[in-house]
Design a protein with these regions (language model features):
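Terminal, low-complexity, charged helical segments
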Residues: 1-6, 15, 49, 53-66, ...
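Amphipathic, well-ordered alpha-helical segments in soluble domains
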Residues: 17, 24, 50, 108-111, ...
Length: 212
């Protein structure tokens, strides 16, 4: 009788250990799914806020490119960064290369690049590439606008010392080269925005947000 009792005790202990292990593994899997869901949701909300900015200011991305210096570039920059995540960059475009605004600008660009990489890692399929490319193009557009604003600032400073025509100042600082780079960046951003702005694309992404 004691022999059978020991046997069943061993069996019950083994079953209890197995159940505990199963529950532990299940809890880990659920925890991992929750963490993945949280990461996906956070990145989705951030990129969606930037997409909304591009939607609200689509004319800046699609308007006819003028063959003259863009003296309102700083205002365009502010419009394209006018949300709670990006608004700290307003001072950066108003005071290019000045601290602490310049460091804040560099940090935010790095955050955007990191977000683009993270998007590819936590979302599946080609859909992730569309969004990561959009983030990279957005970051590159801000960089081009910032670089162009430095040129505009130098043109204004030069003109305050030695008044010249706008055409002369443009030639002196190779303004057209930077303007062309700006236009190219804006065109790429428009194309990548058009890709992610499609309803079917967003629906595919939202399906991956479901916690299962």
């Amino acid at each position: 009788m004691l022999k059978y009792w020991n046997f069943w005790c061993t069996v019950m202990t083994s079953i209890a250990a197995f159940i505990a292990l199963y529950l532990s593994v299940r809890q880990i899997k659920l925890g991992n799914k929750q963490q993945l869901f949280d990461r996906r949701l956070k990145v989705y909300m951030l990129v969606n806020s930037i997409i909304s900015l591009c939607k609200e200011n689509y004319t800046l991305l699609s308007e006819k490119r003028e063959a003259e210096p863009q003296l309102t570039n700083d205002f365009s920059f502010i419009y394209l960064t006018n949300n709670t995540y990006m608004e700290s960059l307003a001072k950066a475009i108003q005071y290019p290369l000045e601290q602490p605004f310049h460091n804040e600008f560099l940090k935010k660009r790095e955050d955007l690049r990191s977000m683009a990489v993270e998007f590819e890692l936590i979302f599946k399929g080609n859909i992730s590439l569309l969004y990561s490319n959009f983030l990279r193009d957005y970051e590159q557009t801000l960089a081009a606008m910032y670089q162009y604003q430095i040129v505009i600032k130098r043109m204004k400073e030069e003109n305050s010392k030695y008044p010249r025509t706008l055409e002369e100042l443009s030639q002196l600082f190779s303004e057209k080269k930077f303007r062309d780079s700006l236009y190219e960046a804006l065109d790429k951003l428009r194309e990548s925005y058009d890709a992610v702005a499609q309803e079917k694309v967003e629906n595919k992404l939202r399906k991956q947000l479901v916690l299962i």
